[in-house]
Amino acid sequence: MSHSRYFFTSESVSEGHPDKVSDQISDAVLDEFIKQDPNSRVACETFVTTGQVIVGGEVTTKGIVDIQTIARKTITEIGYTKGEYMFDANSCGVLSALHSQSPDINRGVDRKEEIEDEFDRVGAGDQGMMFGYACTDTPELMPAAIQYAQELVRLLAEIRKEGKIMTYLRPDSKSQVTLEYDENDKVLRVDAVVVSTQHDPEPAGMSEAEFQEVIKNDIIENVIRKVIPAELIDENTKFHINPTGRFEIGGPHGDTGLTGRKIIVDTYGGAAPHGGGAFSGKDPSKVDRSAAYAARHVAKNIVAAGLADKCTVQVSYAIGVARPVSIYINTHGTGKHGLSDSQIQEKAEAIFDLRPLAIIRRFNLDRPHGWCYRDTAAYGHFGREQFPWEKTEKVAELKAAFGL
Protein backbone atom coordinates (compact mmCIF):
# COMPACT_ATOMS: atom_id res chain seq x y z
CA MET A 1 0.00 0.00 0.00
CA SER A 2 1.20 3.50 -0.79
CA HIS A 3 -0.08 5.30 2.31
CA SER A 4 1.75 5.52 5.62
CA ARG A 5 0.49 4.72 9.11
CA TYR A 6 -2.96 6.09 9.87
CA PHE A 7 -5.71 6.21 12.49
CA PHE A 8 -9.28 4.99 12.02
CA THR A 9 -12.24 5.38 14.39
CA SER A 10 -15.64 3.70 14.76
CA GLU A 11 -18.40 4.09 17.34
CA SER A 12 -21.27 2.04 18.70
CA VAL A 13 -24.21 2.57 21.02
CA SER A 14 -25.94 0.24 23.47
CA GLU A 15 -29.44 -1.23 23.34
CA GLY A 16 -30.52 1.54 25.73
CA HIS A 17 -29.60 4.35 23.35
CA PRO A 18 -32.85 6.03 22.22
CA ASP A 19 -32.30 5.33 18.51
CA LYS A 20 -31.62 1.69 19.32
CA VAL A 21 -34.73 1.49 21.52
CA SER A 22 -36.64 2.57 18.41
CA ASP A 23 -34.85 0.04 16.19
CA GLN A 24 -35.59 -2.79 18.61
CA ILE A 25 -39.28 -1.94 18.93
CA SER A 26 -39.60 -1.76 15.13
CA ASP A 27 -37.90 -5.13 14.70
CA ALA A 28 -39.88 -6.72 17.55
CA VAL A 29 -43.07 -5.65 15.74
CA LEU A 30 -41.68 -7.07 12.48
CA ASP A 31 -40.84 -10.37 14.21
CA GLU A 32 -44.42 -10.78 15.40
CA PHE A 33 -45.93 -10.00 11.99
CA ILE A 34 -43.60 -12.47 10.25
CA LYS A 35 -44.24 -15.12 12.91
CA GLN A 36 -47.98 -14.90 12.20
CA ASP A 37 -47.68 -14.41 8.43
CA PRO A 38 -44.29 -15.08 6.76
CA ASN A 39 -45.44 -13.13 3.70
CA SER A 40 -46.07 -9.95 5.70
CA ARG A 41 -44.95 -6.69 4.12
CA VAL A 42 -43.80 -4.39 6.92
CA ALA A 43 -42.26 -0.92 7.10
CA CYS A 44 -42.36 -0.02 10.79
CA GLU A 45 -40.92 3.21 12.22
CA THR A 46 -40.73 4.07 15.91
CA PHE A 47 -40.34 7.41 17.71
CA VAL A 48 -39.47 7.53 21.41
CA THR A 49 -39.21 10.51 23.74
CA THR A 50 -39.99 11.37 27.37
CA GLY A 51 -42.82 9.04 28.43
CA GLN A 52 -43.99 8.43 24.87
CA VAL A 53 -43.69 5.85 22.06
CA ILE A 54 -45.20 6.27 18.58
CA VAL A 55 -45.17 3.31 16.19
CA GLY A 56 -46.10 4.08 12.59
CA GLY A 57 -45.67 2.73 9.09
CA GLU A 58 -47.19 0.56 6.42
CA VAL A 59 -48.18 -3.10 6.67
CA THR A 60 -49.78 -5.75 4.46
CA THR A 61 -50.42 -8.89 6.52
CA LYS A 62 -52.86 -11.52 7.68
CA GLY A 63 -51.46 -11.17 11.21
CA ILE A 64 -52.91 -9.23 14.12
CA VAL A 65 -50.28 -7.73 16.40
CA ASP A 66 -50.68 -6.09 19.81
CA ILE A 67 -48.33 -3.12 19.39
CA GLN A 68 -48.78 -1.99 23.02
CA THR A 69 -47.67 -5.31 24.45
CA ILE A 70 -44.69 -5.70 22.11
CA ALA A 71 -43.43 -2.16 22.72
CA ARG A 72 -43.70 -2.45 26.51
CA LYS A 73 -42.09 -5.91 26.57
CA THR A 74 -39.17 -4.67 24.46
CA ILE A 75 -38.64 -1.60 26.66
CA THR A 76 -38.77 -3.79 29.78
CA GLU A 77 -36.15 -6.18 28.39
CA ILE A 78 -33.87 -3.26 27.51
CA GLY A 79 -34.11 -2.08 31.12
CA TYR A 80 -36.26 1.06 31.23
CA THR A 81 -38.37 -0.02 34.19
CA LYS A 82 -38.00 2.82 36.72
CA GLY A 83 -40.00 6.01 36.97
CA GLU A 84 -36.89 8.12 37.60
CA TYR A 85 -35.70 7.32 34.06
CA MET A 86 -38.65 9.44 32.80
CA PHE A 87 -39.22 6.68 30.25
CA ASP A 88 -40.72 3.60 31.84
CA ALA A 89 -42.15 0.51 30.14
CA ASN A 90 -45.15 0.38 32.46
CA SER A 91 -46.20 4.03 32.35
CA CYS A 92 -45.14 5.41 28.95
CA GLY A 93 -47.80 6.11 26.35
CA VAL A 94 -47.80 3.87 23.26
CA LEU A 95 -49.55 5.12 20.13
CA SER A 96 -49.93 2.87 17.07
CA ALA A 97 -50.28 4.56 13.69
CA LEU A 98 -49.69 1.56 11.42
CA HIS A 99 -51.77 1.40 8.24
CA SER A 100 -52.02 -0.49 4.94
CA GLN A 101 -49.18 -0.54 2.43
CA SER A 102 -49.69 1.16 -0.93
CA PRO A 103 -51.16 -1.29 -3.48
CA ASP A 104 -48.88 0.34 -6.08
CA ILE A 105 -45.82 -1.02 -4.25
CA ASN A 106 -47.52 -4.36 -3.64
CA ARG A 107 -48.15 -4.82 -7.34
CA GLY A 108 -44.46 -4.53 -8.18
CA VAL A 109 -43.17 -6.75 -5.40
CA ASP A 110 -45.61 -9.64 -5.13
CA ARG A 111 -45.50 -12.75 -7.26
CA LYS A 112 -46.30 -12.56 -10.96
CA GLU A 113 -47.60 -16.08 -11.58
CA GLU A 114 -47.18 -15.97 -15.37
CA ILE A 115 -43.37 -15.84 -15.01
CA GLU A 116 -41.87 -19.34 -15.16
CA ASP A 117 -38.86 -18.94 -12.83
CA GLU A 118 -40.19 -18.52 -9.30
CA PHE A 119 -37.25 -16.31 -8.28
CA ASP A 120 -38.01 -13.93 -11.15
CA ARG A 121 -41.60 -13.44 -9.96
CA VAL A 122 -40.72 -11.38 -6.88
CA GLY A 123 -39.40 -7.92 -7.63
CA ALA A 124 -37.26 -5.73 -5.39
CA GLY A 125 -39.29 -3.69 -2.90
CA ASP A 126 -37.54 -0.48 -3.93
CA GLN A 127 -34.70 0.91 -5.98
CA GLY A 128 -31.33 1.56 -4.38
CA MET A 129 -27.80 0.33 -3.86
CA MET A 130 -26.53 -1.78 -0.99
CA PHE A 131 -23.01 -2.61 0.15
CA GLY A 132 -21.32 -5.55 1.82
CA TYR A 133 -17.80 -5.67 3.20
CA ALA A 134 -15.31 -8.02 4.81
CA CYS A 135 -11.65 -7.81 5.80
CA THR A 136 -9.06 -9.78 7.73
CA ASP A 137 -8.84 -7.42 10.75
CA THR A 138 -10.67 -9.84 13.07
CA PRO A 139 -11.68 -13.53 13.16
CA GLU A 140 -15.22 -12.38 12.31
CA LEU A 141 -13.79 -10.77 9.14
CA MET A 142 -15.03 -7.39 10.33
CA PRO A 143 -13.18 -4.07 10.66
CA ALA A 144 -11.58 -4.11 14.11
CA ALA A 145 -12.72 -0.67 15.31
CA ILE A 146 -16.45 -1.37 14.93
CA GLN A 147 -16.09 -4.93 16.25
CA TYR A 148 -14.43 -3.73 19.46
CA ALA A 149 -16.86 -0.81 19.82
CA GLN A 150 -19.84 -3.20 19.56
CA GLU A 151 -18.34 -5.61 22.09
CA LEU A 152 -17.69 -2.81 24.61
CA VAL A 153 -21.31 -1.68 24.83
CA ARG A 154 -22.61 -5.25 24.63
CA LEU A 155 -20.48 -6.25 27.64
CA LEU A 156 -21.55 -3.11 29.49
CA ALA A 157 -25.20 -4.13 29.02
CA GLU A 158 -24.48 -7.70 30.16
CA ILE A 159 -22.85 -6.40 33.35
CA ARG A 160 -25.81 -4.06 33.98
CA LYS A 161 -28.38 -6.82 33.54
CA GLU A 162 -26.42 -9.31 35.64
CA GLY A 163 -26.46 -6.81 38.50
CA LYS A 164 -23.47 -8.23 40.40
CA ILE A 165 -20.98 -5.40 39.85
CA MET A 166 -21.27 -1.80 38.68
CA THR A 167 -24.84 -1.71 40.00
CA TYR A 168 -25.03 2.02 39.28
CA LEU A 169 -25.29 1.44 35.51
CA ARG A 170 -28.34 2.67 33.59
CA PRO A 171 -29.31 1.51 30.07
CA ASP A 172 -27.94 4.27 27.80
CA SER A 173 -24.28 4.11 26.72
CA LYS A 174 -21.91 4.77 23.82
CA SER A 175 -18.44 3.61 22.83
CA GLN A 176 -15.78 4.72 20.36
CA VAL A 177 -12.50 3.06 19.39
CA THR A 178 -9.56 4.62 17.52
CA LEU A 179 -7.01 2.23 16.04
CA GLU A 180 -3.60 2.85 14.53
CA TYR A 181 -2.87 0.89 11.35
CA ASP A 182 0.48 0.28 9.66
CA GLU A 183 1.36 0.85 6.01
CA ASN A 184 -0.06 -2.58 5.11
CA ASP A 185 -3.46 -1.97 6.73
CA LYS A 186 -2.68 -4.15 9.76
CA VAL A 187 -3.83 -3.07 13.22
CA LEU A 188 -0.85 -1.90 15.29
CA ARG A 189 -2.46 -0.65 18.49
CA VAL A 190 -5.46 1.00 20.11
CA ASP A 191 -4.86 4.73 20.32
CA ALA A 192 -8.03 5.79 22.17
CA VAL A 193 -11.19 4.36 23.71
CA VAL A 194 -14.21 6.47 24.60
CA VAL A 195 -17.01 5.07 26.79
CA SER A 196 -19.91 7.16 28.05
CA THR A 197 -22.46 5.42 30.23
CA GLN A 198 -25.59 6.58 31.96
CA HIS A 199 -25.50 5.99 35.71
CA ASP A 200 -27.38 6.49 38.99
CA PRO A 201 -26.70 9.59 41.13
CA GLU A 202 -23.52 9.41 43.19
CA PRO A 203 -23.94 7.60 46.54
CA ALA A 204 -24.34 9.63 49.72
CA GLY A 205 -21.02 10.81 51.06
CA MET A 206 -19.26 10.57 47.70
CA SER A 207 -18.49 13.60 45.52
CA GLU A 208 -19.23 13.67 41.79
CA ALA A 209 -15.49 13.59 41.02
CA GLU A 210 -14.93 10.59 43.30
CA PHE A 211 -17.87 8.73 41.75
CA GLN A 212 -16.67 9.41 38.21
CA GLU A 213 -13.25 8.04 39.18
CA VAL A 214 -14.93 4.84 40.41
CA ILE A 215 -16.86 4.57 37.13
CA LYS A 216 -13.70 5.17 35.10
CA ASN A 217 -11.69 2.50 36.89
CA ASP A 218 -14.57 0.00 36.73
CA ILE A 219 -15.02 0.47 32.98
CA ILE A 220 -11.30 0.23 32.22
CA GLU A 221 -10.85 -2.96 34.26
CA ASN A 222 -14.21 -4.74 33.80
CA VAL A 223 -15.07 -3.72 30.25
CA ILE A 224 -12.21 -2.32 28.14
CA ARG A 225 -9.53 -4.78 29.27
CA LYS A 226 -11.96 -7.67 28.82
CA VAL A 227 -12.71 -6.70 25.20
CA ILE A 228 -9.56 -5.14 23.74
CA PRO A 229 -6.63 -7.58 23.31
CA ALA A 230 -3.92 -6.70 25.83
CA GLU A 231 -1.22 -6.54 23.16
CA LEU A 232 -3.04 -3.63 21.46
CA ILE A 233 -3.03 -1.45 24.60
CA ASP A 234 0.16 0.42 25.46
CA GLU A 235 1.28 3.29 27.69
CA ASN A 236 0.07 5.81 25.11
CA THR A 237 -3.46 4.43 24.80
CA LYS A 238 -5.94 7.06 25.98
CA PHE A 239 -9.12 6.23 27.92
CA HIS A 240 -11.93 8.81 27.90
CA ILE A 241 -14.62 7.61 30.31
CA ASN A 242 -17.69 9.85 30.74
CA PRO A 243 -15.51 12.77 29.59
CA THR A 244 -18.22 15.36 30.38
CA GLY A 245 -18.69 14.02 33.91
CA ARG A 246 -22.19 13.29 35.22
CA PHE A 247 -24.47 11.30 32.86
CA GLU A 248 -27.66 10.64 34.84
CA ILE A 249 -30.25 11.84 32.32
CA GLY A 250 -30.24 9.61 29.26
CA GLY A 251 -32.28 7.32 27.08
CA PRO A 252 -35.41 8.69 25.38
CA HIS A 253 -35.75 11.34 28.11
CA GLY A 254 -32.32 12.74 27.29
CA ASP A 255 -32.64 12.48 23.49
CA THR A 256 -35.47 11.63 21.15
CA GLY A 257 -34.98 8.30 19.38
CA LEU A 258 -35.94 7.29 15.84
CA THR A 259 -35.71 4.06 13.86
CA GLY A 260 -32.94 4.02 11.28
CA ARG A 261 -30.62 6.69 12.65
CA LYS A 262 -27.68 4.42 13.44
CA ILE A 263 -26.95 2.92 10.02
CA ILE A 264 -23.15 3.14 10.37
CA VAL A 265 -23.25 1.52 13.82
CA ASP A 266 -25.42 -1.20 12.26
CA THR A 267 -22.87 -1.96 9.54
CA TYR A 268 -19.11 -1.38 9.29
CA GLY A 269 -18.43 1.70 11.40
CA GLY A 270 -17.59 3.83 8.39
CA ALA A 271 -14.96 1.40 7.04
CA ALA A 272 -17.12 0.66 3.99
CA PRO A 273 -19.63 2.61 1.89
CA HIS A 274 -23.32 2.61 2.82
CA GLY A 275 -26.22 2.79 0.39
CA GLY A 276 -28.25 4.91 2.82
CA GLY A 277 -31.12 2.54 3.57
CA ALA A 278 -31.73 1.55 7.19
CA PHE A 279 -32.55 -2.04 8.19
CA SER A 280 -34.82 -2.19 11.24
CA GLY A 281 -38.58 -2.46 10.85
CA LYS A 282 -38.31 -3.66 7.23
CA ASP A 283 -39.43 -7.08 6.04
CA PRO A 284 -37.01 -9.03 3.80
CA SER A 285 -38.73 -8.07 0.52
CA LYS A 286 -37.10 -4.70 1.11
CA VAL A 287 -33.67 -4.98 -0.45
CA ASP A 288 -32.30 -2.21 1.78
CA ARG A 289 -32.09 -4.99 4.34
CA SER A 290 -31.98 -8.36 2.58
CA ALA A 291 -29.55 -7.35 -0.17
CA ALA A 292 -27.20 -5.73 2.35
CA TYR A 293 -27.16 -9.06 4.19
CA ALA A 294 -26.51 -10.89 0.92
CA ALA A 295 -23.72 -8.48 -0.06
CA ARG A 296 -22.01 -9.12 3.29
CA HIS A 297 -22.35 -12.86 2.67
CA VAL A 298 -20.65 -12.53 -0.72
CA ALA A 299 -17.83 -10.33 0.62
CA LYS A 300 -17.23 -12.54 3.66
CA ASN A 301 -17.05 -15.74 1.62
CA ILE A 302 -14.60 -14.15 -0.84
CA VAL A 303 -12.28 -13.12 2.01
CA ALA A 304 -12.77 -16.41 3.90
CA ALA A 305 -11.83 -18.29 0.72
CA GLY A 306 -8.49 -16.47 0.69
CA LEU A 307 -9.22 -14.70 -2.60
CA ALA A 308 -8.58 -11.27 -1.03
CA ASP A 309 -7.81 -9.57 2.29
CA LYS A 310 -10.53 -6.96 1.77
CA CYS A 311 -13.68 -7.00 -0.31
CA THR A 312 -16.42 -4.47 -0.98
CA VAL A 313 -19.55 -5.63 -2.82
CA GLN A 314 -22.16 -3.26 -4.25
CA VAL A 315 -25.50 -4.47 -5.60
CA SER A 316 -28.32 -2.29 -6.96
CA TYR A 317 -31.98 -2.83 -7.85
CA ALA A 318 -34.98 -1.31 -9.60
CA ILE A 319 -38.37 -1.48 -7.88
CA GLY A 320 -40.43 -4.43 -9.10
CA VAL A 321 -37.48 -6.01 -10.95
CA ALA A 322 -36.00 -9.22 -9.55
CA ARG A 323 -32.53 -9.27 -11.06
CA PRO A 324 -29.97 -6.74 -9.81
CA VAL A 325 -29.38 -3.74 -12.06
CA SER A 326 -25.66 -3.94 -11.27
CA ILE A 327 -23.11 -5.86 -9.22
CA TYR A 328 -19.64 -4.49 -8.39
CA ILE A 329 -16.79 -6.14 -6.51
CA ASN A 330 -13.63 -4.34 -5.37
CA THR A 331 -10.82 -6.08 -3.46
CA HIS A 332 -8.85 -2.85 -2.97
CA GLY A 333 -5.69 -4.26 -4.50
CA THR A 334 -5.60 -7.17 -2.03
CA GLY A 335 -6.57 -9.93 -4.47
CA LYS A 336 -4.61 -13.19 -4.17
CA HIS A 337 -3.45 -15.87 -6.62
CA GLY A 338 -3.15 -13.30 -9.40
CA LEU A 339 -6.94 -12.95 -9.58
CA SER A 340 -8.45 -9.72 -10.88
CA ASP A 341 -11.61 -8.18 -9.46
CA SER A 342 -13.44 -8.92 -12.71
CA GLN A 343 -12.50 -12.61 -12.50
CA ILE A 344 -13.70 -12.81 -8.89
CA GLN A 345 -16.91 -10.97 -9.80
CA GLU A 346 -17.67 -13.30 -12.71
CA LYS A 347 -17.48 -16.40 -10.50
CA ALA A 348 -19.30 -14.73 -7.61
CA GLU A 349 -22.22 -13.78 -9.85
CA ALA A 350 -22.52 -17.42 -10.91
CA ILE A 351 -22.36 -18.74 -7.33
CA PHE A 352 -24.49 -16.19 -5.43
CA ASP A 353 -28.08 -15.59 -6.61
CA LEU A 354 -28.92 -12.01 -5.63
CA ARG A 355 -32.58 -11.95 -6.64
CA PRO A 356 -34.74 -10.97 -3.62
CA LEU A 357 -36.63 -14.27 -3.29
CA ALA A 358 -33.39 -16.24 -3.69
CA ILE A 359 -31.87 -14.21 -0.84
CA ILE A 360 -34.96 -14.73 1.34
CA ARG A 361 -34.89 -18.50 0.75
CA ARG A 362 -31.12 -18.83 1.24
CA PHE A 363 -31.21 -17.21 4.69
CA ASN A 364 -34.82 -18.15 5.63
CA LEU A 365 -35.49 -14.47 6.16
CA ASP A 366 -39.26 -15.03 6.15
CA ARG A 367 -38.98 -17.81 8.76
CA PRO A 368 -36.04 -16.99 11.04
CA HIS A 369 -34.79 -19.97 13.02
CA GLY A 370 -32.41 -19.58 15.96
CA TRP A 371 -32.42 -15.79 15.62
CA CYS A 372 -34.94 -12.99 15.23
CA TYR A 373 -34.86 -9.54 13.69
CA ARG A 374 -34.83 -7.87 17.08
CA ASP A 375 -31.50 -9.63 17.74
CA THR A 376 -29.98 -7.66 14.87
CA ALA A 377 -31.24 -4.30 16.13
CA ALA A 378 -28.48 -3.72 18.71
CA TYR A 379 -24.72 -4.40 18.53
CA GLY A 380 -24.52 -4.73 14.75
CA HIS A 381 -26.07 -6.77 11.96
CA PHE A 382 -22.70 -8.21 10.92
CA GLY A 383 -19.82 -10.06 12.56
CA ARG A 384 -22.15 -12.16 14.74
CA GLU A 385 -22.16 -15.86 14.00
CA GLN A 386 -25.81 -16.54 14.89
CA PHE A 387 -26.98 -14.88 11.69
CA PRO A 388 -27.16 -17.02 8.51
CA TRP A 389 -25.57 -14.38 6.25
CA GLU A 390 -22.39 -14.79 8.33
CA LYS A 391 -21.92 -18.41 7.25
CA THR A 392 -18.96 -19.19 4.98
CA GLU A 393 -20.45 -22.26 3.33
CA LYS A 394 -19.57 -21.03 -0.17
CA VAL A 395 -15.79 -21.06 0.45
CA ALA A 396 -15.23 -24.50 -1.09
CA GLU A 397 -17.27 -23.60 -4.17
CA LEU A 398 -15.36 -20.34 -4.66
CA LYS A 399 -12.00 -22.09 -4.31
CA ALA A 400 -13.06 -24.82 -6.73
CA ALA A 401 -14.13 -22.20 -9.28
CA PHE A 402 -10.51 -21.04 -9.41
CA GLY A 403 -8.93 -24.48 -9.05
CA LEU A 404 -7.56 -23.70 -5.59
Curated annotation (Swiss-Prot):
Matching SUPFAM superfamilies: S-adenosylmethionine synthetase
Q: Where is this region: Disordered?
A: 1-20
Q: Which CDD domains match?
A: S-AdoMet_synt (cd18079)
- Please state the Enzyme Commission number of this protein: 2.5.1.6
The reaction(s) annotated as catalysed by this protein in its Swiss-Prot or TrEMBL entry are: L-methionine + ATP + H2O = S-adenosyl-L-methionine + phosphate + diphosphate
**Note on how the cofactor is bound:** Binds 2 divalent ions per subunit.
Query: What keywords were assigned to this record?
Result: ATP-binding, Cytoplasm, Magnesium, Metal-binding, Nucleotide-binding, One-carbon metabolism, Potassium, Transferase
Q: Which GO terms describe its biological process?
A: one-carbon metabolic process; S-adenosylmethionine biosynthetic process
User: Which residues are Mg(2+)-binding?
Assistant: D19
What GO terms fall under cellular component here? cytoplasm
* Stated role: Catalyzes the formation of S-adenosylmethionine (AdoMet) from methionine and ATP. The overall synthetic reaction is composed of two sequential steps, AdoMet formation and the subsequent tripolyphosphate hydrolysis which occurs prior to release of AdoMet from the enzyme.
The UniProt family comment states: Belongs to the AdoMet synthase family.
Quaternary arrangement and interactors, per the entry?
Homotetramer; dimer of dimers.
Q: Which PANTHER family match?
A: S-ADENOSYLMETHIONINE SYNTHETASE
Name of the protein in question: S-adenosylmethionine synthase
State the organism of origin: Chlorobaculum parvum (strain DSM 263 / NCIMB 8327) (Chlorobium vibrioforme subsp. thiosulfatophilum)
